[in-house]
């Protein structure tokens, strides 16, 4: 089976700074992959290249068998910032891309109803973003991305600004939506527990210049539950990922973490 996303010797330079050094990675159709690594290792840069928001200095990235040359409707992007239009209601935000595409009002309503229900925002369809909590705003952003029917979701620390309990709830909401439709997901995070809880595979990137260090499979069943999160199997994978990330930190950062 051909991969859905392929990074082939991807290099990214900013002037004299090498951000990515020959990154090679394949992500399968319908797979949920999380990407972790020390700060500055190029996680977000890799995602932005996949989104078509940056052009690599070398190598190529393929979606299916087509080179990525810019943004495309087959890729939806969700950032840590909610990026909602504050003057539009929740429903209007979800329907925005559909409206731009010329879809009929009846069809837009059908699609927005479905995804608002999926993320638990039906009762807030007519509310403005200012009336929503942080978690609700991000659920709206997820519904908007899903409504546009992308084949791939690229998510850059989408839950990073949320409190711990809301973050766990959002992880479950996202997995519920993913399990129903099996879009391909590339999810960037600094949270090791989050990375393991969500993913089929955890991609660990090496310290700068960014490159693939190792791929850690997550052999845990879906649906993921609190019992799985508390299981010895989860703890073992979580510890393996944590040690992989920790040993990628620059030596000075490791010393700081020990108070030296």
Curated annotation (Swiss-Prot):
It holds the Pfam family ABC_tran. Transmembrane segments: none annotated. One of its GO terms (molecular function) is ATP binding. Gene3D superfamilies: P-loop containing nucleotide triphosphate hydrolases. One of its GO terms (cellular component) is plasma membrane. Keywords: ATP-binding, Cell inner membrane, Cell membrane, Membrane, Nucleotide-binding, Translocase, Transport. Residues 5-228 form the ABC transporter domain. It is a peripheral membrane protein. CDD domains: ABC_NrtD_SsuB_transporters. It is found in: Cell inner membrane. Coiled coil: none annotated. ATP binds at residues 37-44. It comes from the Bacteria. Its EC number is 7.-.-.-. Belongs to the ABC transporter superfamily. The complex is composed of two ATP-binding proteins (BAB2_1147), two transmembrane proteins (BAB2_1148) and a solute-binding protein (BAB2_1146). Probably part of an ABC transporter complex. Probably Responsible for energy coupling to the transport system. This is Putative ATP-binding protein BAB2_1147. It comes from Brucella abortus (strain 2308).
């Amino acid at each position: 089976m051909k991969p859905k996303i392929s990074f082939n010797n991807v290099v990214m330079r900013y002037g004299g700074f090498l951000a990515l050094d020959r990154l090679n990675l394949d992500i399968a159709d319908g797979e949920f992959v999380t990407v972790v690594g020390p700060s500055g290792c190029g996680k977000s840069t890799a995602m932005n290249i996949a989104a078509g928001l940056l052009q690599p200095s070398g190598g190529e990235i393929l979606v299916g068998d087509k080179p990525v040359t810019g943004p495309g409707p087959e890729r939806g992007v969700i950032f840590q910032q909610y990026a909602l239009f504050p003057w539009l209601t929740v429903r209007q935000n979800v329907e925005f891309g559909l409206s731009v595409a010329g879809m009929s009002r009846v069809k837009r309503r059908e699609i927005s109803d479905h995804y608002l229900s999926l993320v638990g925002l039906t009762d807030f369809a007519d509310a403005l973003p200012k009336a929503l909590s942080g978690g609700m705003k991000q659920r709206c952003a997820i519904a908007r991305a899903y409504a546009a029917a992308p084949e791939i979701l690229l998510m850059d620390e989408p839950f990073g600004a949320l409190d711990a309990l809301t973050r766990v709830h959002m992880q479950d909401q996202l997995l519920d939506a993913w399990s129903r439709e099996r879009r391909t997901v590339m999810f960037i995070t600094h949270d090791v527990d989050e990375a393991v809880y969500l993913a089929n595979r955890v991609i660990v990137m090496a310290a700068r210049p960014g490159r693939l260090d190792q791929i850690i499979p997550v052999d845990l069943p879906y649906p993921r539950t609190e019992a799985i999160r508390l299981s010895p199997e989860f703890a073992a994978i979580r510890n393996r990922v944590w040690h992989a990330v920790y040993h990628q930190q620059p030596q000075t950062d490791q010393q700081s973490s020990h108070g030296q």
